[in-house]
Design a protein with these regions (language model features):
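Conserved phosphate-donor/acceptor-positioning beta-strand/loop module used by diverse small-molecule
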Residues: 193, 197-200, 226-246
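Hydrophobic positions on the alpha1 helix immediately C-terminal to the Walker A/P-loop
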Residues: 128
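NTP-dependent small-molecule kinase module
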Residues: 241, 248-301
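Hydrophobic anchor at the beta1->P-loop junction of P-loop NTPases
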Residues: 117
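Conserved NTP-donor binding/palm subdomain of two-metal-ion nucleotidyltransferases/polymerases, i.e.
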Residues: 1-26, 30-113
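P-loop (Walker A) phosphate-binding loop of NTP-binding proteins
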Residues: 120
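Conserved lysine of the Walker
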Residues: 125
Length: 301
């Protein structure tokens, strides 16, 4: 923008921001009359306008470069055609309007992507998701869709033989539970949030412990055809011995079998296979690129 002589000023000490720091953000103040030229200059540098409800005097711009998220918060200066009102009643009304706008859908098309991170225990799902939460400088929601075991049951569980009817009922219960959890995630995605799923019900396609054929068939239908498929799927991958060394759950042979099942089931369906044995930063960077691609497609940039 300097080359185009666009007038702007840094805010909140942003001229000293380290752009290479995770989750960094640059705040500027800009005259509304300069906005058109500024947006054209930012587009040339790979930035995209991120429509965010409830912020009428702010324009957000997002870019992704070599595994890093870059964000510019451009606040429109008062005046120059921007109508403002003062006083406590107007301020309260503005806050209420902002809160309502942040909960409404951005449009007729869902703007926020739903990205699922899958993999056996010890693959690094929690580590990757926490890093993405810290580094992605836009609205982000995390939904846990795994089974919560009671404390003290980290070892292998003995599966009792149950009737086919009871097993089918359990599959139905799990489907209803996951649908209710996914509803919260998709509501956030409709408001523009990036939604990260820590596990996902579609894992049942790879790891099916059903003992009866009727329950296995029902699970394939409910979880494979009627469960909403994420916009992007990342399969975190590591050898069984490495997975066992990280969490000491199951056995190396069981974990290796699960690893192969994840690879064979989801990679042919378009999932991104991300190795977590080449360093955590490399895995985070690759997962970030997957999320960016999903956001880019949902926003139609």
């Amino acid at each position: 923008m300097d080359h185009r002589r666009i007038r702007y000023a840094f805010r909140k000490g942003s001229e000293q921001v380290n752009l290479y720091a995770p989750g960094s953000e640059v705040d500027i103040l800009i005259d509304p009359l300069e906005l058109h030229d500024a947006e054209r200059a930012l587009r040339e540098q790979g930035f995209h306008w991120l429509d965010a409800p409830g912020c009428p005097r702010h324009r957000f711009y997002l870019a992704f470069d070599r595994g890093r998220w870059l964000k510019i918060d451009a606040k429109l200066a008062r005046g120059s055609g921007v109508t403002t009102r003062s006083g406590r009643p107007w301020k309260a009304a503005e806050q209420l309007a902002t809160a309502l706008a942040q909960r409404r859908p951005l449009g007729l098309r869902r703007a926020g992507p739903v990205v699922a991170l899958l993999g056996p225990d010890g693959a690094g799902k929690g580590t990757i998701i926490e890093a993405l939460r810290e580094r992605i400088p836009v609205g982000l929601s995390v939904v846990y869709l795994g089974e919560r075991r009671p404390r003290g049951t980290s070892g292998p569980r003995v599966r009792a033989r149950v009737s086919a009817l009871r097993e089918c009922a359990f599959v139905m219960y799990r489907a209803l539970r996951f649908w209710s959890l996914l509803l919260r995630g998709y509501l956030a995605a409709w408001s523009g949030h990036i939604v990260l799923c820590d596990r996902h019900p579609i894992e049942a396609l790879a790891i099916r412990p059903r003992t009866s054929r009727s329950a296995a068939w029902l699970e394939r239908v409910l979880f494979g055809r009627l469960m909403p498929w994420p916009d992007a799927v990342a399969v975190l991958d590591a050898p069984g011995e490495v997975l066992y060394a990280r969490k000491r759950e199951h056995s190396p042979n069981v974990l290796e079998h699960q690893r192969q099942r994840y690879r064979d089931t989801f990679v042919p369906r378009g999932a991104r296979l991300i190795s977590t044995t080449n360093g955590v930063e490399a895995a985070i960077s690759e997962a970030s690129a997957l999320v960016w691609t999903a956001l880019h497609e949902r926003r139609r940039w």
